[in-house]
């Protein structure tokens, strides 16, 4: 067993400079999957080279896609839609929940056996939300108790197209069903009552899938996919990941006399919940150099130290910022007044019980907070006096690790996390980037 690697963050001042955040994790996974399915070559610029994404690349290679890195781009020669090969060994996704769930959807309708395994954290996460629609399509499944990994899919001779209303706001469920529809004759329909990140829909259209999206008067989206399309390789430029940008954003807002610019960040409207919330808290964040890259809105973010105030974050906003709540909780600890985060029960089934881990980390660093089944209330104060000094258990969760290192840059006393290794699952450059801006982490 590998040894844990603790690391400590110390009170810092005057963060400054420019950084370019690594490519968006959601788009990186989808680029590899669709590139691996398409005919011809797909060229990817700005791929996030994190452990999670590379595990998805390995899975696509195991099923017949040719993937190589050449200079600063990745080149994929796909198998052609409907032509994946059966993997000879179980597909190991490590910590990658997104990769595992999307690939389950993609391979489910193939008439072959595919086994999925992962690390201890991923093996605790529920997969039923993906497996239930696959069962309706005719996929037979052998899973560990509670629909968890390890699990094996046995695809049908001919999958059934389904019309499926998503019971929870989940881009992963929506995307898995649409990817399953690619190798299913007929029309697959996903009904989405609450908008979630829409990268899959945009990218499917770009690769040549026949996709129709209608929205009713209540805002419910009906996404219709005609099965078995011809997919053609594309050139993709991946913008910076807003979920990773959250950490330097919060650091610059909280560390006194800071002024940083984060270049080339994705500002898709379905991913803007954190920035909208921070603006409500009086954060000084400017969107500069706004433009489009590959159909996505992108901007540079200029962030300056700000005196934040507590706010109530409505539950309706949760899908657009579900991965950013750990960073927001740190901001809330140093904001004047009470911050209430509602409708965040989805955090309980992330890489850890993220809601519980957040509350534990805040309390051990002397922040007054209340944890409920689906909410977190943080009683913040603009003074850092008396805060920090804790040793945080990260529970193998990269976002808990990064959040409390940011906390330590602001608090009076240093903050230590029990292990930094899992940060590599989403943001391998995190520590050197923060150090480059002037943050004290060692």
UniProtKB/Swiss-Prot annotation:
> Keywords of this protein's UniProt record, alphabetized?
Amino-acid biosynthesis, Aromatic amino acid biosynthesis, Cytoplasm, Transferase
Name the positions where phosphoenolpyruvate binds: 25, 97, 125, 172, 354, 399
- Protein's pathway: Metabolic intermediate biosynthesis; chorismate biosynthesis; chorismate from D-erythrose 4-phosphate and phosphoenolpyruvate: step 6/7
Q: Which residues bind 3-phosphoshikimate?
A: 25-26, 30, 170, 172, 323, 350
Q: Which InterPro entries match?
A: Enolpyruvate_Tfrase_dom, Enolpyruvate_Tfrase_sf, EPSP_synthase, EPSP_synthase_CS, RNA3'P_cycl/enolpyr_Trfase_a/b
Q: Which reaction is recorded as catalysed by this protein?
A: 3-phosphoshikimate + phosphoenolpyruvate = 5-O-(1-carboxyvinyl)-3-phosphoshikimate + phosphate
Catalytic residues of the enzyme? 323 (proton acceptor)
Q: Where in the cell is it found?
A: Cytoplasm
Q: How does it assemble?
A: Monomer.
HAMAP family named in the record: EPSP_synth
Any idea what this protein is called?
Answer: 3-phosphoshikimate 1-carboxyvinyltransferase
> Which gene codes for it?
aroA
């Amino acid at each position: 067993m590998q040894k844990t690697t603790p690391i400590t963050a110390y009170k810092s001042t005057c963060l400054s400079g420019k950084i370019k955040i690594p490519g968006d994790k959601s788009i990186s996974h989808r680029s590899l999957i669709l590139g691996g399915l398409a005919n011809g070559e797909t060229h990817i610029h700005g791929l996030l080279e994190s452990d999670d994404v590379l595990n998805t690349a390995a899975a696509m290679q195991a099923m017949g896609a040719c993937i190589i890195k050449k200079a600063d781009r990745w080149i994929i020669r796909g198998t052609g839609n409907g032509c994946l090969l059966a993997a000879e060994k179980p597909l190991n996704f490590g910590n990658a929940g997104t990769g595992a769930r999307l690939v389950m959807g993609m391979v489910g309708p193939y008439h072959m056996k595919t086994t999925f395994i992962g690390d201890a954290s991923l093996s605790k996460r529920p997969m039923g939300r993906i497996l239930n629609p696959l069962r309706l399509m005719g996929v037979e499944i052998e899973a560990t108790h509670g629909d968890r990994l390890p699990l094996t899919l046995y695809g049908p001779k001919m999958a059934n197209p389904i019309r499926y209303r998503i019971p929870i706001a989940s881009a992963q469920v929506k995307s898995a069903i649409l990817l399953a529809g690619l190798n299913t004759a007929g029309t697959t329909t996903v009904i989405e009552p609450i908008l979630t990140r829409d990268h899959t829909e945009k990218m499917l259209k770009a690769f040549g899938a026949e996709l129709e999206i209608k929205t009713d008067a209540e805002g419910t989206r009906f996404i219709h996919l005609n099965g078995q399309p011809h997919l053609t390789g594309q050139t993709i430029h991946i913008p910076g990941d807003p979920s990773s940008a959250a950490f330097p954003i919060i650091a610059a807002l909280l560390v006194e006399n800071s002024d940083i610019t984060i270049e080339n960040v994705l500002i898709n409207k379905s991913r803007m919940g954190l920035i909208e919330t921070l603006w409500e808290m009086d954060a000084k964040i400017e969107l500069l150099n706004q433009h489009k890259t590959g159909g996505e809105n992108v901007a540079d973010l200029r962030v300056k130290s700000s005196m934040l105030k507590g706010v109530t974050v409505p539950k309706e906003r949760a899908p657009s910022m579900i991965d950013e709540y750990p960073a927001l909780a740190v901001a809330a600890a140093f904001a004047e007044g009470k911050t209430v985060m509602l409708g965040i029960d989805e955090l309980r089934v992330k890489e850890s019980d993220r809601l519980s881990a957040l509350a534990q980390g805040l309390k051990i660093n002397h922040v007054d907070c209340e944890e409920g089944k689906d909410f977190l209330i943080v009683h913040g104060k603009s003074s850092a006096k008396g805060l920090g000094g804790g040793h945080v258990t990260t529970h193998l969760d990269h976002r808990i690790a990064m959040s409390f290192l940011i906390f330590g840059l602001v608090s009076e006393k240093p903050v230590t996390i029990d292990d930094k290794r899992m940060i590599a699952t989403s943001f391998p450059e995190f520590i050197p980037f923060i150090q480059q801006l002037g943050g004290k982490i060692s």
